[in-house]
Amino acid sequence: MSVISMKQLLEAGVHFGHQTRRWNPKMAPYIFTERNGIYIIDLQQTVEKLEQAYEFVKKLAMEGGTILFVGTKKQAQDSIKEEAERCGMFYVNQRWLGGTLTNFKTIRGRIQRLKELKKMEEDGTFDVLPKKEVIKLRKEKERLQKFLGGIENMQSLPSALFIVDPKKEAIAVAEARSLEIPIVAIVDTNCDPELIDYPIPGNDDAIRAVKLITSKIADAVIEGNQGEQFAASEE
């Protein structure tokens, strides 16, 4: 039973690439044809590549690994958050803060600050502070929550990244590569697939296409986690 059907991919518009003038020649092997100035992605390869990515993610989750879901473009923000939360993983869906991976210690410090502010709000500290200061602290908390909320409980570097539009998330790609963290990504016709360990050729601009593929990656995590629980109960 394959992970995804051609019908699902077609209905979600996964086959629509970018305009032909905005392309990366390295994506040529994944292009089926050109129609009305737009490249059409070869969905047979999408099926194959998604299956490879699915197996990789499932095995990783089975071994207790973690995945960081990354997608900050408007079309990806909701899917990234929803699917990462559904499978109990971490996400970045606002702005990628430079150093999120390569300077993780500093990022952990900012997360610690977020936790402190949350605690202050909960234990009544805010009630006894001057109103002006509380407004300032609440603003700081909201800002930290916005950018770091999705990685608040990420204790160490992730085992892998799942990225929507690696061209837009070039900093995340560079950081993961420098730390040799494997990358799974949806690569559209304007991306460089050679930078990605598990490229999934597909439309990274349509909400439905992004949601479909992101949900399959989350499914792989869930399936892998069930395998991990099963293995633990067998011991």
UniProtKB/Swiss-Prot annotation:
<dbReference type="InterPro" id="IPR005706">
    <property type="entry name" value="Ribosomal_uS2_bac/mit/plastid"/>
</dbReference>
<dbReference type="GO" id="GO:0003735">
    <property type="term" value="F:structural constituent of ribosome"/>
</dbReference>
<keyword id="KW-0687">Ribonucleoprotein</keyword>
<comment type="similarity">
    <text>Belongs to the universal ribosomal protein uS2 family.</text>
</comment>
<dbReference type="GO" id="GO:0022627">
    <property type="term" value="C:cytosolic small ribosomal subunit"/>
</dbReference>
<keyword id="KW-0689">Ribosomal protein</keyword>
<dbReference type="Pfam" id="PF00318">
    <property type="entry name" value="Ribosomal_S2"/>
</dbReference>
<dbReference type="InterPro" id="IPR023591">
    <property type="entry name" value="Ribosomal_uS2_flav_dom_sf"/>
</dbReference>
<dbReference type="GO" id="GO:0006412">
    <property type="term" value="P:translation"/>
</dbReference>
<dbReference type="InterPro" id="IPR018130">
    <property type="entry name" value="Ribosomal_uS2_CS"/>
</dbReference>
<dbReference type="InterPro" id="IPR001865">
    <property type="entry name" value="Ribosomal_uS2"/>
</dbReference>
<protein>
    <recommendedName>
        <fullName>Small ribosomal subunit protein uS2</fullName>
    </recommendedName>
</protein>
